[in-house]
């Protein structure tokens, strides 16, 4: 049967209109704090799947925020997708840098980790776990909860990372004000070894300089373990989870490509790729031993709104009393 000419013309015009926008978006620019060894393969997998080229700029989270905000205020709209720590993502959302997100994979994410405004959504997680040197500490020695580390026998054996006030804030709120504060005052009396940098803390545990770390990212410990280092980790309860977020810039030059990239990262393929590189997926559909336990999610809004309060307390308890290194 012949197709009437007017109907054929209408179909062709509609197809052209639908693909015109996609045809223009043949590249996108990503700002991220994800290490090049992981962000690179993620970008390459997306390019292979879609043919859309990813221009990658990687820096620490503070520099990602600084560049994104500076460019937006100067009305230089260069970035399409931003990916970094949740508190920094919330900071940029408040500057109205992002567009509201919708994704077919939104339902796969833990509801507690998704902000109501959806200007950014979590794509991976950092879990604060207990890591230990397997040559110096037996797994059976470790307490089942953080309360057990108040035992004086752990004095001189435990370490924490220097910037983890959000971990403390989350646990204090979970345990209840006074009880939570009392716990951290007692922990401070044990004078834990304070080190700057989560990667460094994990490396010091593997080297035996710190026997047990209370605020180690499990992905960092897992990475060293896979390389044969004498380190392992345990999800001592309560486990605190800090989301890492991804967003499309409000004035993205390539919005369709940007949204396609976000969907790819959140898809089972993207999340499985993160797992293969030792990262923890945000998706509840992708299970791994790296996320197969209960956890409490850091509230990035609280981190921002109450950061002075918690940073001051953290400084008083753990930093000022610590000898200079």
Could you describe each region identified by the protein language model?
Residues 157-237:
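Ligand-binding pocket segment of bilobal, Venus flytrap-like solute-binding proteins
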